[in-house]
Regions:
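Phosphate/nucleotide-binding beta-alpha loop and adjacent structural elements of enzyme active sites
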Residues: 1-283
Length: 283
């Protein structure tokens, strides 16, 4: 009953102009039809269970990656405007803004970024095979040219242990372990240098939701951070108390010339000195 109430409320908010996305299909259907007011496009997302439905609700109906909240400040130019201007500068220079989606789950976040930044190049990572296949299905259903890897992200390439805490398909974790071959891990640096791009790309955004893996990711090899003007991360001290999973991230970001803004479950880390636009160097 709760999801029907949420669905009805979301329709009312869309009608009065307060929401960007509209879920057209009733919640019980496995094939969900959506509409995006901003791009004037409809799209499809297949769901397996309630966990998928709530994931979509967070991404689209709560619009959790929106930058619109950054307009409420005292500066003449908002951070949202700066980021959008930088995105437009990249495309005007003939490059594609590179977005790396670490922890794509069912593909909803990658679809969101594709709709919001349609001229971008998106690399999506997901450790769980069932989530990876679901994500692949949803991306193909919308004919999106997004590269999706059945890998996890880490500070360096390697392998890790797959961990299912029993909290549903949006809570799978991986712990780096050289003796394990459960999950293949790839670093941000390797993604940038080793993946073959048909187009010229330049760093733009990294989204990180890796269920505590941020502790290892931000432990070393962090030079890539300065190249990405926008990081969006969900931290997980609440999920793994007394394990200081967010400590390395907080230490790293505090040393950078970046703003640090909380919204909902996510932290938005925004550069105060946007990097020079350049094509990624493969050497």
């Amino acid at each position: 009953m709760k999801i029907y109430i949420l669905w009805f409320i979301s329709i009312m908010k869309f009608v009065i102009g307060r929401k960007r996305f509209l879920l057209i299909s009733p919640p019980f259907l496995k094939k969900q039809l959506w509409y995006d007011k901003k791009s004037n496009q409809s799209f499809i997302i297949y769901i397996r269970n309630l966990t998928d439905w709530y994931t979509n609700w967070q991404v689209f109906l709560e619009d959790q990656f929106s930058l619109s909240f950054l307009t409420n400040n005292l500066s003449k130019v908002s951070k949202e405007e700066e980021i959008n201007d930088y995105y437009n500068q990249i495309t005007k220079n003939g490059y594609k803004p590179l977005i790396i989606d670490c922890g794509s789950n069912n593909g909803a976040s990658s679809i969101y970024f594709s709709l919001t930044y349609p001229k971008s190049k998106i690399i999506s990572l997901e450790i769980d095979e069932s989530n990876y296949l679901q994500s692949l299905k949803n991306l193909k259903s919308n004919r999106l040219e997004i590269v999706i890897l059945n890998q996890g992200v880490a500070s360096e390439d390697g392998y890790g242990n797959f961990i299912d805490p029993g909290l549903g398909n949006n809570a799978y974790r991986v712990e780096k372990n050289s003796g394990s071959k459960d999950v293949s891990l790839i670093s941000i640096t390797s993604i940038i240098k080793n993946i073959s791009f048909k187009e010229k790309v330049t760093p733009f955004l990294v989204k990180i939701d890796i269920e505590g893996g941020e502790k290892e990711l931000f432990s070393k090899n962090k030079d890539w951070i300065k190249d990405f003007p926008l990081l969006i991360a969900e931290l997980h001290d609440w999920l793994l108390p007394a394990q200081t999973t967010s400590l390395n991230f907080l230490k790293t970001i505090s040393e950078q010339n970046r703003d640090f803004v909380y919204r909902g479950e996510n932290i938005f880390s925004i550069s105060n000195q946007f990097p020079k636009i350049y094509p990624i160097d493969k050497t």
